């Protein structure tokens, strides 16, 4: 298969994946999906499995279960039966069996105490999305007072710390999610840092200093200054690729020099509120 044919083939299958992610709440027939890929229904299953690493039905179910796991962890007001029905299951029993097979915990147990380390280990490794040229801008970031919770430990457990921070915001009304900014400060690269030494700060903007608390949330500030910023759209799993684009492609050609402060992210929306393909995250690289 020459490069042009291979690229067109992959692009068709990526369009199928994009369609699936945007229509998880709807019936997804093999006939309709194979037509999108310009393929026969008899061969499409094998083509999709070879390209993505997962059978089509497992890919669709995994996306629905993954979305359900976010709702279980971060939307305590959502009932398990409603989450099960929204994930395409006809009853809670079949949802429970599928969820436990996928993530090693029942939905109720996951809601009470999610094992994020096991969750990440069970996530299927799919074909990487093609990296496109990204629009990098240089902006003046203002000094921003924040409430901050530091996660120190395995990067796959950051979601547990995020859940604590979200609960603190909801319970105290300080740094309200709807009207405040949300940031993450990436002190270390998870690919090169021993898990026990990995640090990631979870932050929400505040107007006034916060009170002392037992959660570990403290007052801090993200310093102002020049930053390169690029917007990442889609799953946070592919966020490292956008970060590496800044360092590998943009920075060497820009003539700029990084400042002595780590890359940080601003989360413009959240995975328990929107579909993954709708996630928007601004990546900031501080510059001198």
UniProtKB/Swiss-Prot annotation:
InterPro entries assigned to the protein according to its UniProt record, in alphabetical order: AraC_E-bd, DNA_gyrase_inhibitor, GyrI-like, Homeodomain-like_sf, HTH_AraC, HTH_AraC-typ_CS, Reg_factor_effector_dom_sf, Tscrpt_reg_AraC-type_HTH
One Pfam family per UniProt: HTH_18
Keyword entries, A-Z: DNA-binding, Transcription, Transcription regulation
SUPFAM superfamilies listed in its UniProt record: Homeodomain-like, Probable bacterial effector-binding domain
DNA-binding residues: 31-52, 80-103
Stored Gene3D superfamilies: Homeodomain-like, Regulatory factor, effector binding domain
SMART domains in alphabetical order: AraC_E_bind, HTH_ARAC
Region Putative effector binding domain, residue ranges: 111-288
Molecular-function GO terms, alphabetical: DNA-binding transcription factor activity; peptide binding; sequence-specific DNA binding
GO biological-process terms attached to the record: cellular response to antibiotic
Domain HTH araC/xylS-type: 14-113
Superkingdom field: Bacteria
Task of the protein: Probable transcription factor.
Subunit-structure text: Homodimer.
Additional note from the record: Duplication of the STM3175 gene increases tolerance of albicidin.
Domain commentary: Binds the peptide antibiotic albicidin with sub-micromolar affinity.
Name listed for the protein in its UniProt record: Probable HTH-type transcriptional regulator STM3175
Organism: Salmonella typhimurium (strain LT2 / SGSC1412 / ATCC 700720)
Lineage of the species this protein comes from: Bacteria, Pseudomonadati, Pseudomonadota, Gammaproteobacteria, Enterobacterales
């Amino acid at each position: 298969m020459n490069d042009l044919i291979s690229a067109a083939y992959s692009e068709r299958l990526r369009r199928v994946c994009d369609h699936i992610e945007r229509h998880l709440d709807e019936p997804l027939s093999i006939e309709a999906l194979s037509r999108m890929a310009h393929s026969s229904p008899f061969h499409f299953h094998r083509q999709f499995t070879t390209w993505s690493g997962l059978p089509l039905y497992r890919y669709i179910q995994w996306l629905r279960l993954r979305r359900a796991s976010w709702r279980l962890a971060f939307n305590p007001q959502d009932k398990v039966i409603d989450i099960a029905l929204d994930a395409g299951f006809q009853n809670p029993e079949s949802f429970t069996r599928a969820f436990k097979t996928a993530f090693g915990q029942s939905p109720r147990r996951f809601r009470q105490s999610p094992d994020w380390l096991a969750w990440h280990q069970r996530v299927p490794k799919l074909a990487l999305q093609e990296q496109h040229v990204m629009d990098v801008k240089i902006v003046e970031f203002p000094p921003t007072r924040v409430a901050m919770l530091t996660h120190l430990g395995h990067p796959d457990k950051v979601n547990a710390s995020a859940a604590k921070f979200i609960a603190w915001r909801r319970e105290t009304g300080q740094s309200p999610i709807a009207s405040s900014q949300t940031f993450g400060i990436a002190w270390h690269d998870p690919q090169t840092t021993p898990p026990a030494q990995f640090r990631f700060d979870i932050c929400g903007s505040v107007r006034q200093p916060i009170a002392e608390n037992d959660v570990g949330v403290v007052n801090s500030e993200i310093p102002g200054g020049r930053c390169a910023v690029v917007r990442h759209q889609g799953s946070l799993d592919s966020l490292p690729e956008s970060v590496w684009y800044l360092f590998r492609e943009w920075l060497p050609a820009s003539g700029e020099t990084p400042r002595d402060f780590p890359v940080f992210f601003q989360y413009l929306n959240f995975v328990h509120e929107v579909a993954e393909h709708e996630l928007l995250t601004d990546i900031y690289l501080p510059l001198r």
